Curated annotation (Swiss-Prot):
PANTHER family per record: DNA-DIRECTED RNA POLYMERASE SUBUNIT OMEGA (PTHR34476:SF1)
Gene3D superfamilies according to UniProt: 3.90.940.10
Stretches of the chain forming a coiled coil according to its record: none
Keyword rRNA processing part of the UniProt annotation: no
Quaternary organization: The RNAP catalytic core consists of 2 alpha, 1 beta, 1 beta' and 1 omega subunit. When a sigma factor is associated with the core the holoenzyme is formed, which can initiate transcription.
HAMAP family the UniProt entry points to: RNApol_bact_RpoZ
Entry EC number(s): 2.7.7.6
Protein name: DNA-directed RNA polymerase subunit omega
Pfam family, one: RNA_pol_Rpb6
Gene that produces this protein: rpoZ
GO-annotated cellular components: DNA-directed RNA polymerase complex
Organism the protein comes from: Xylella fastidiosa (strain M12)
Role: Promotes RNA polymerase assembly. Latches the N- and C-terminal regions of the beta' subunit thereby facilitating its interaction with the beta and alpha subunits.
Keyword Cell membrane in annotation: no
Length: 98
């Protein structure tokens, strides 16, 4: 596949600074296991894959923010479930000590 350039992405995102923010957020999501929206036949690194998605108009800042919010909510929910399980385990240990 042809090399991706900043100019390719600037056709989609008008501001270089916004492009950097979008690409870095999306690359972080991809690195954390969020599935890509385009095929990754060449096993590109998350940063390159993020830029390819932006250039292909498969992702925008609103979508990135929604994915980020969903991931944050999932992480918080898992933390709450873990904390609740710890409380139950602590209560069980306290009861067995009596």
């Amino acid at each position: 596949m042809a090399r991706i350039t900043v100019e390719d992405c600037l056709e989609v995102v008008n501001n270089r600074f916004e492009l950097v923010m979008m690409a870095s957020k999306r690359a972080r999501q991809l690195a954390n296991g969020v599935p890509p929206l385009i095929e990754n036949n060449s096993e590109d690194k998350p940063t390159v894959l993020a830029l390819r998605e932006i250039a292909a108009r498969k992702i925008n800042s609103k979508m990135i923010d929604e994915i980020e919010k969903a991931e944050r909510e999932r992480t918080e929910r898992e933390a709450m479930e873990w904390a609740a399980a710890e409380v139950v385990a602590d209560e069980d240990i306290s009861k067995s000590d009596d």
